[in-house]
Amino acid sequence: MKKILVTGGTGFIGSHTVVSLLKSGHQVVILDNLCNSSINILPRLKTITGQEIPFYQGDIRDREILRRIFAENRIDSVIHFAGLKAVGESVAEPMKYYDNNVSGSLVLAEEMARAGVFKIVFSSSATVYGDPGKVPYTEDMQPGDTTSPYGTSKSMVERILSDIQKADPRWSVILLRYFNPIGAHESGLIGEQPNGIPNNLLPYICQVAAGKLPQLAVFGGDYPTPDGTGMRDYIHVMDLAEGHVAAMQAKSNVAGTHLLNLGSGRASSVLEIIRAFEAASGLTIPYEVKPRRAGDLACFYADPSYAKAQIGWQTQRDLTQMMEDSWRWVSNNPNGYDD
């Protein structure tokens, strides 16, 4: 049984990964500063897993709390989610993103090495590919020109961790580039609760469904896609969580830098997502087509075959289940974790 430190473990993907880790027989310690999550998730995680999870409230840039965590726990590996993730905000406040995401990751890596912990799984993103001009995205594609400081910060941390591993072969660095996580845990107890107006499609749809927003803005209806709207590779958050566990179990004892795409290999359009959500919820989602957003691509999706070959993982849940689980979460928790 391994003890895993999960940074950002009360966030959307982090919390679902905590559930998956515990289900797989691992022990978990969570570090989160709660800047984009709620303390109220902790009793819900206990309800789902039947376990009390050690929680430290703090920041990955805080060496003191990191040293305390490593001193008080025999940590085997770190799964690193902690970071800011709003693309638009990153354009407006780049220094905030580089300080948090890049400097924070560097402090974390330094304190890991100081504690003798050399296994890290990093939550990266398909945004590091930029616009490669072809689909599907494969791991041998070079990172491109990112369209936001958020994407650049992910690319920079990938490079930093890869360089650290080259300099010190004790390290196992696992870089997971994932696509568009949606859905929620099947219990309806945990899900995505963005602060403010959501940046991503499904939380936006959910807020319209809950009556918090009057209609959905669909950015771009003239893309070269079958229905004119942008197409993305959507992945159920529990599939993504299980991908983290599979990658850690398969590769954390193998020195080197391991890069994997985690996606479904299928692209769905904005209108397809709206229709699928309407079918799951029985509601009608009003929407208005607006001009394209700068930097948005027409279509991208993963080639997931390398992940299947390397770690024996592939997605198990289809679009219908993603929508049903999302609707269960939002209908049971109209105010998120604030109920």
Swiss-Prot record:
The gene is galE. Substrate binds at S125, Y150, N180, N200, L201, A217, V218, F219, R232, R293, A294, G295, D296. One of its GO terms (molecular function) is UDP-glucose 4-epimerase activity. Pfam families: Epimerase. One of its GO terms (cellular component) is cytosol. NAD(+) binds at residues 12-13, 32-37, 59-60, 81-85, 100, 125, 150, 154, 179. It catalyses: UDP-alpha-D-glucose = UDP-alpha-D-galactose. Belongs to the NAD(P)-dependent epimerase/dehydratase family. Involved in the metabolism of galactose. Plays an essential role in the incorporation of galactose into meningococcal lipopolysaccharide surface molecules, which are important for pathogenesis. Catalyzes the conversion of UDP-galactose (UDP-Gal) to UDP-glucose (UDP-Glc) through a mechanism involving the transient reduction of NAD. PANTHER family: UDP-GLUCOSE 4-EPIMERASE. Its cofactor is NAD(+). Homodimer. The active site is at Y150 (proton acceptor). Its EC number is 5.1.3.2. Gene3D superfamilies: NAD(P)-binding Rossmann-like Domain, UDP-galactose 4-epimerase, domain 1. Pathway: Carbohydrate metabolism; galactose metabolism. This is UDP-glucose 4-epimerase. GO terms for biological process: galactose metabolic process. It is an enzyme of class 5 (isomerase). Keywords: Carbohydrate metabolism, Galactose metabolism, Isomerase, NAD. It comes from Neisseria meningitidis serogroup C. Coiled coil: none annotated.
